[in-house]
From Swiss-Prot:
Keyword annotations from UniProtKB, A to Z: Amino-acid biosynthesis, Cytoplasm, Histidine biosynthesis, Lyase
Organism: Shewanella baltica (strain OS185)
One example of a Gene Ontology biological process annotation: L-histidine biosynthetic process
Name of the protein: Imidazole glycerol phosphate synthase subunit HisF
Intracellular or extracellular location(s): Cytoplasm
Length: 257
């Protein structure tokens, strides 16, 4: 059995790490490089950095801090934000990122997924999916440009259909960002993650809702995800990564120590 991964997420805006609730009202929580170094020291398995306004503002993630992070940490990290071309992806990988993640640009141009996979291999192509439960239609729908509240828009895609589409096009991993749960620390959306797990043949990373150590245990056991991503519980030192790993190991979950 492959060990489960713990992945702190750092949302970046204007050169600072920020955190919102349900993708709104972002507040500054710290500086990029010191936070990255802290999580690596605590035992994070990898890190994810989202430049949350890059796509909405028609720009690419700032490479200057990517190289500084690469110099400071010795664990893999993934970078996302406005990546729309092979050359942009190549540059970020050259600056030290191990993986690149695309979200809104893939919705605009799904062929980008297969082109990136052909160039770099599927192992470093991650697809982020911002999924919103629409109570009116009782369905899960994909949203786009979610890093800027004013720019956020609905797409034509139901979440399960988009999950299948991105796999056909060659993604190596999927991060499912459950918008309704984001930042509220009420637990991961086990129901939705389980539905996606059933149709997902690539590694699936749960995102949105972590509030206690038990939430991590539950998402690994019940939704059978490969990794759990979290932000506010780590930023605010509610949960220490080393202590979380000890807890999960004691609960019988295979975890990297």
């Amino acid at each position: 059995m492959l060990a489960k991964r713990l992945v702190p997420c750092l949302d970046v805006k204007d050169g600072k790490v920020v955190k919102g609730v349900q993708f709104r009202n972002h507040e500054i929580v710290g500086d990029i490089v010191p936070l990255a170094a802290r999580y690596a020291e605590e035992g994070a398995d990898e890190l994810v950095f989202y430049d949350i306004t890059a796509s909405a503002h028609e720009r690419v993630v700032d490479k200057s801090w990517v190289s500084r992070v690469a110099e400071q940490i010795d664990i893999p990290f993934c970078v996302a934000g406005g990546i729309k071309t092979i050359s942009q992806a190549r540059e970020l990988l050259a600056f030290g990122a191990d993986k690149i993640s695309i979200n809104s640009p893939a919705l605009t141009d799904p062929s980008l997924i297969s082109r990136l996979q052909d160039e770099f291999g599927r192992q470093c192509i991650v697809i982020g999916i911002d999924s919103f439960f629409d109570a009116t239609s009782n369905s899960y729908k994909v949203k786009q440009f979610t890093g800027d509240e004013a720019a956020t828009k609905d797409t034509q895609w139901f979440t399960q259909d988009w999950v299948e589409e991105v796999q056909k096009r060659g993604c190596g991993e999927i991060v499912l960002n459950v918008m309704n749960q984001d930042g509220v620390r009420g637990g991961y959306d086990i129901k939705q993650l389980s539905l996606v797990r059933a149709i997902c043949d690539v590694p699936l990373i749960a995102s949105g809702g972590a509030g206690t150590m038990a939430h991590f245990r539950d998402v690994f056991i019940e939704a059978k995800v490969d990794a759990a991503l979290a932000a506010s519980v780590f930023h605010k030192a509610i949960i220490n990564i080393g202590e979380l790993k000890a807890y999960l190991a004691a609960e019988g979950i295979a975890i990297r120590r």
